[in-house]
Each structure stands twice: as C-alpha cells, then as structure tokens.
C-alpha cells in the first residue's frame, strides 16, 4: 500500500487505521486524519498507557486486531515531538 494515497492532496496514511507510539509509553490506535506542525490528528481513537495499565501494549494491540478499536476518544492530536513511530495497524505482527 505504500505510495497509494486514498485522497490526493492528503497524507499517505489518511484514512488508514494506525498504531501510533509515543516516547512516554502511550499507544494510540485510530484512523489517521492528518499531520501538520502541531502533530498527528487521529479519529475514533483507543489509548493505552503502558505505565497505568495491567494490560501490556502487545495484548492491547492483539485485542484491538481481534475485536476492533474500542474508542476512548473521538479525536486526538499527538504532538510531533512525542511521536516515536506511527504506521498501519495492519503491518503489526500480533
């Protein structure tokens, strides 16, 4: 899918369900909307805090892959400086 843009003029990941991980240990799974100087905007987002949950990040991802995104927030903006990595959820090996 690399290089294919669903909507010309939008980010390559626009409309794709992604796993976004931060340096602080937060993981977001949601539909990628856009990215600008303020950060990445996600829609219909599930959030996992590795420090505040009994559930490991790996189990959070496995459950999401199996049952779908359990939406915690309708939208989230993750500041660019906090993003460790972001990519399609479908690329994650669970």
What spans do the regions from the language model cover?
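Conserved RNA-binding domains used in RNP assembly and mRNA/RNA metabolism
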Residues: 2-94
